[in-house]
From Swiss-Prot:
Entry binding sites for [4Fe-4S] cluster: 1
Entries under InterPro entries matching the protein: HTH_CRP, RmlC-like_jellyroll, WH_DNA-bd_sf
Gene label: fnr
One Pfam family cited in the UniProt record for this chain: Crp
Keyword annotations of the record: 4Fe-4S, Activator, Cytoplasm, DNA-binding, Iron, Iron-sulfur, Metal-binding, Transcription, Transcription regulation
Any one Gene Ontology BP term: regulation of DNA-templated transcription
Annotated disulfide bonds: none
Gene induction: By anaerobiosis.
Descriptive protein name: Anaerobic regulatory protein
Subunit structure comment from the entry: Homodimer.
Cofactor(s), by name: [4Fe-4S] cluster
Superkingdom of this protein's organism: Bacteria
Length: 92
């Protein structure tokens, strides 16, 4: 579900605990992304793809979904772009 920024900003201004939770979540996401970038820069193609799938698994699990079975909603091209790999490499 999408909440327009102006509405979320207004609500978080009125509810300090909501603002704190949003900041906590954003900080966690930024930290996770930074760690992924560092890891990916040191990995070969196979390791990058494995780390990507593992990261998705952990995120699904944290949200109460199955960590073992989930649908990849990104295309091979999108995954390749995210990981800095070609579509052919992702397809292998």
């Amino acid at each position: 579900c999408e909440i327009p920024f102006d509405i979320l900003d207004d609500l978080s201004g009125k509810m300090p605990k909501l603002r704190q939770q949003i900041m906590r979540l954003m900080s966690s996401e930024i930290k996770s992304d930074q760690e992924m970038i560092l890891l990916l820069s040191k990995m070969n193609a196979e390791e990058r793809l494995a780390a990507f799938i593992y990261n998705l698994s952990q995120r699904y699990s944290a949200r109460g979904f199955s960590a073992r079975e989930f649908r990849l909603t990104m295309t091979r091209g999108d995954i390749g772009n995210y990981l800095g790999l070609t579509v052919e490499t992702i397809s292998r």
